[in-house]
Amino acid sequence: MLLNLRLDGSSLHVLCSTKTLPISSPLDKFPSFKKLKQNYVPGTHESDKGPQRSTRNGDRGCGTVAHEVVAGKNLLLVNPSNGCVGKSGIIDGFVDKRSKDARFGGNGLVSEVHTKCSTKRLSYGGCIPAILEALDSIEDVEDALSPWAERLSNKERTIILKEQIHWERAVEIFEWFKSKGCYELNVIHYNIMLRILGKACKWRYVQSLWDEMIRKGIKPINSTYGTLIDVYSKGGLKVHALCWLGKMSKIGMQPDEVTTGIVLQMYKKAREFQKAEEFFKKWSCDENKADSHVCLSSYTYNTMIDTYGKSGQIKEASETFKRMLEEGIVPTTVTFNTMIHIYGNNGQLGEVTSLMKTMKLHCAPDTRTYNILISLHTKNNDIERAGAYFKEMKDDGLKPDPVSYRTLLYAFSIRHMVEEAEGLIAEMDDDNVEIDEYTQSALTRMYVEAEMLEKSWSWFKRFHVAGNMSSEGYSANIDAYGERGYLSEAERVFICCQEVNKRTVIEYNVMIKAYGISKSCEKACELFESMMSYGVTPDKCTYNTLVQILASADMPHKGRCYLEKMRETGYVSDCIPYCAVISSFVKLGQLNMAEEVYKEMVEYNIEPDVVVYGVLINAFADTGNVQQAMSYVEAMKEAGIPGNSVIYNSLIKLYTKVGYLDEAEAIYRKLLQSCNKTQYPDVYTSNCMINLYSERSMVRKAEAIFDSMKQRGEANEFTFAMMLCMYKKNGRFEEATQIAKQMREMKILTDPLSYNSVLGLFALDGRFKEAVETFKEMVSSGIQPDDSTFKSLGTILMKLGMSKKAVRKIEEIRKKEIKRGLELWISTLSSLVGIGDCVDEL
């Protein structure tokens, strides 16, 4: 069997049977078309509760009679008595009897559409054009078809059904064919009806029509199943579509290439790329076994190439393209466009250039080809190449579409290429290409960021005065000014919204955000309070924005008030606004208030997340309050929230402050376990562990962390300083000296404590020359020596034979006259150590 779908038999029966359906045939209880026109509103049929949509058959793109009634709209109607086309007055889905002979004005629209349809009908030849005209102009099917009764061929009946735009009319004609008794309705006719009803999402009728086929012994063919799979998958019922595929497999029928293409499209649309690939491979193998000369069409290859591309399988896409060429299938423009898009999206621009050369040998690039190329090169920051392709497109006689202009214009705008952008705008204006709101706001942002405020305002006014801007357009322009701190301009745009009565919650939210960026918290609050007076109700985003603004401005008390209002309106669905207020209280050192907000949050059944716990644990870690910090750790565990690196770092910081080595080690191990090859504990945390180990002279453990940090290039000044102190404390002067030398060579000595550690080591180990040189480096780098520095230097002088009294006298001079005292220290040290005096250079 081709496809072994493991479907439960009972579910298959439910999806593909009519036992639960109230009707046995789509026609058994179907009202006449005349009745439908009077009473029926499409999409509201009482027996169809599934998704509704109005569709047109793709083979017939227009019509002169509107059989659908849409509430509140005027539709085209034909007066059966005189064939005149006019408007219908529609009230609440029903035809207004007062507008019987209403007609269109002379704008040429109706005649143009009718001409296109007439041309299509005439192409059929024979009696078909007259039949279709009759069906459009005469309401009763019997009257419309009576001149041709009992002499319509199978082909003519097929065309008549296929040409129907509305499913109701198609059903009525289909029923008329059956009622005549002289017409044999074959599987092709049923296939057409299944497609028409499926496109209209009339699933109960589809199922009933299927049952009717089986009952009458009309055997489904490959295209029948393909049609069913197609309409169900496009109607959003993928499980039902798979059910029909399963039924097909169950009777041993192998999908043909068309049906296979439908299945592949279904999987691709659902982004189930692996299933699409598996199905294609199984089908291809079976096809090749059955007929070794089977050659797939370009459509099937294009579908698979696109499927591989969307799933990121470049190699497979390339191999499929290669196989297509080997089998002699001429690639289409769609094929090349797809391959260019795949290679370009994966950064293989060399392959893109090669494909373009090959493409020009087989088929002409279209506008979409150039749009893809322009987009790819703008994304890769090759704006010059993108512009060249835009020019090439026009040189080839292709007219850029709105996508072409929009892509290039956006690329110019984000790069502040004002002159190029303005040139493109002029071209768009000359060609009457509409500039969409997304592009308009991008250009406003370009002018703002280029500090061309006058131009930005005139650009905005152009679209504002035209009166076509939506709320989203106004809000985007407010945001363009607000993000750059141009508050007065943002306010002017906001006022313009009021002029055209387009103020919605979106504009208020963006304006409040702009006030927040400019630190105008009072204005943000005033605007919030004024919303209701303009009939605009704040939404969740409004409250969230205002609370975040106040919290970040160190105004947690006010933020808490709005948080309470937010909770009362039912907009608090998570802990994010509470976390903002808690963090603000913590920042101000008001931990009692932070805990109060936390308790309030828990009381209202709003669950804290790891960020909330992290803020509180870190706050109490900073104060060294182990008990409070651990209480939140326990609360987090009880809530089933796993710790993360932020929590672990805070705990290690806490344990370091209070000297809890075992607890710190346990947490550090967890931190290491949660890390990977590219992520390690942060520098501060590792330094904390080295500090704990060095205080306890646990040299090997400290060295292990130190070596690991050096390998990653993360060891900083304090890492080296702690290792130096540990070695010095344990009398390991050789290792300590090596550390000191490394610190000097790496030029990472920037802190008085680090310098003092190095000076203390050199003084203790008798390395007086290095000590003096280090002291000179310290002074020349502008780092102020302190009492600890001179204590080490005094030790050196006394070891070199100077009396304690003389050393004390030098120090007294330094305290009275800093500059003279430093010069005296340096000259004395240099003289006794035997190195050149560099006082003049200092």
From Swiss-Prot:
Ranges annotated as biased composition (Basic and acidic residues): 45-59
SS bonds (residue pairs): none
PROSITE patterns: PPR
Span of the signal peptide: none
Residue segments, region Disordered: 40-61
Gene3D superfamilies according to UniProt: Tetratricopeptide repeat domain
Ranges occupied by PPR repeats: 186-220, 221-255, 256-290, 297-331, 332-362, 366-400, 401-435, 436-470, 474-500, 504-538, 539-573, 574-608, 609-643, 644-674, 682-712, 716-750, 751-785, 786-820
Gene Ontology CC: chloroplast
Alphabetical GO biological process terms: chloroplast disassembly; regulation of DNA-templated transcription; singlet oxygen-mediated programmed cell death
Lineage: superkingdom: Eukaryota
Ribonucleoprotein listed as a keyword: no
Pfam families for this protein: PPR_2 (PF13041), PPR_3 (PF13812)
Entry keyword set: Repeat
Family stated for the protein in its record: Belongs to the PPR family. P subfamily.
Protein name stated in the entry: Pentatricopeptide repeat-containing protein At3g23020
Organism: Arabidopsis thaliana
UniProt lineage: Eukaryota, Viridiplantae, Streptophyta, Embryophyta, Tracheophyta
